[in-house]
Swiss-Prot record:
Belongs to the PsbM family. Pfam families: PsbM. The lineage of its organism: Bacteria, Bacillati, Cyanobacteriota, Cyanophyceae, Synechococcales. One of the components of the core complex of photosystem II (PSII). PSII is a light-driven water:plastoquinone oxidoreductase that uses light energy to abstract electrons from H(2)O, generating O(2) and a proton gradient subsequently used for ATP formation. It consists of a core antenna complex that captures photons, and an electron transfer chain that converts photonic excitation into a charge separation. This subunit is found at the monomer-monomer interface. The keyword Electron transport does not apply. Its main location: membrane. It is a single-pass membrane protein. GO terms for cellular component: photosystem II; plasma membrane-derived thylakoid membrane. It comes from Synechococcus sp. (strain CC9902). InterPro entries: PSII_PsbM, PSII_PsbM_sf. The chain crosses the membrane at residues 7-27. This is Photosystem II reaction center protein M. GO terms for biological process: photosynthesis, light reaction. PSII is composed of 1 copy each of membrane proteins PsbA, PsbB, PsbC, PsbD, PsbE, PsbF, PsbH, PsbI, PsbJ, PsbK, PsbL, PsbM, PsbT, PsbX, PsbY, PsbZ, Psb30/Ycf12, peripheral proteins PsbO, CyanoQ (PsbQ), PsbU, PsbV and a large number of cofactors. It forms dimeric complexes.
Amino acid sequence: METNDLGFVASLMFILVPAIFLIVLYIGTNRSEA
């Protein structure tokens, strides 16, 4: 079973980085409004 680790990590980062950015941005706006 051959897996492309680099492609897996790249796709994982492609999903996680925007998700983390949106979560941080969401928490930041909630704290500023509260």
